[in-house]
């Protein structure tokens, strides 16, 4: 059980971060079968023909600088229960809230740098665009300074994701707790 102070610190961290909502950490989020209809009514892009991959795509359209349904009964179970490594550290007090907020700011700055290097695309999901660009560079014979800079920044961001959020690779499924 999270006490009230830890809970409010967790809320502050989550609401100021949102990387699990914006498509920067995940391509999609899981839904329970009982949540499919309400998620569709909320305007989420739901997919569910395969029970092992039932969910909605990211970025979440209900993220508007912070979650717009955070206190709603329709708030999906996965969203309510997901805890990244950094959040767990704030809850167990091994990382202070101010330090965690600084880390989130670092992540957002790294993402902003990567966004500027990604080609324009109609796809709103950062993670998918990053995967596509890395695959294109891997299959390309061109090895210029721009490609090298992109790969170095992408590698640094992915290592940061792993160390800070415990998101280990580009195509990992969101874990359900």
Write out the residue ranges for each language-model feature.
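Hydrophobic scaffolds flanking metal-cofactor catalytic centers in soluble metalloenzymes
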Residues: 1-177
């Amino acid at each position: 059980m999270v006490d009230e102070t830890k809970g409010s610190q967790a809320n502050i961290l989550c609401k100021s971060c949102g990387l699990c909502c914006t498509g920067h950490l995940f391509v999609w989020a899981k839904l329970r079968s009982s949540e499919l209809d309400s998620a569709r009514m909320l305007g989420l892009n739901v997919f569910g023909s395969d029970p092992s991959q039932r969910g909605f795509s990211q970025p979440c359209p209900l993220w508007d600088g912070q979650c717009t349904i955070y206190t709603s009964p329709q708030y999906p179970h996965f969203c309510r229960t997901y805890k990244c490594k950094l959040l767990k550290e704030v809850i167990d007090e091994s990382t202070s809230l101010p330090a965690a907020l600084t880390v989130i700011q670092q992540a957002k700055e790294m993402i902003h740098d990567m966004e500027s290097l990604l080609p324009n695309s109609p796809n709103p999901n950062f993670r998918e665009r990053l995967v596509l660009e890395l695959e294109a560079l891997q299959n390309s014979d061109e090895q210029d300074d721009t490609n090298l800079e992109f790969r170095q920044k992408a590698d640094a961001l992915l290592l940061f994701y792993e160390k800070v959020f415990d998101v280990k690779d580009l195509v990992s499924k969101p874990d359900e707790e």
